[in-house]
Amino acid sequence: MEKTIKLIRVSLGIIFLWYGMLKFFPQLSPAEDLAITTIHKLFFGLINDTLSIKLLAIWEVTVGLGFIFGIYTRYVVVLFLAHMICTFTPLFILPDISFTHAPYAFTLVGQYIVKNVVFILAGILIYQNEINQRKEVKTV
């Protein structure tokens, strides 16, 4: 089971590193416009769009590298889960691009968002594994 969880952690890391790196290059990430629009609405336009996408890129790359190398895993999972929770906000603040018929028929964007449930469960699994490993070390 340990090897499987490590594979899940590294796989999530690769995905986050990849998606994050794309955001450093304008119009390369297919999620860029969605991310910029969401951040713009969440922060009432107070954060410059270019800055917001760069900060998101840094966040995603940090999570990716943390998962790939297994460093500060508990903290990385917290950053990861915070990010994942934020990915659901377009369902509420941008329903016109998330649904064809709210709340049951998703657009491609809505499907892209909802698939993150699987990522969240993987993150919880990684976190629980980290906690269990720490308990084992303390009892030895």
What are these regions (language model features)?
Residues 1-140:
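Membrane-interface extramembranous regions
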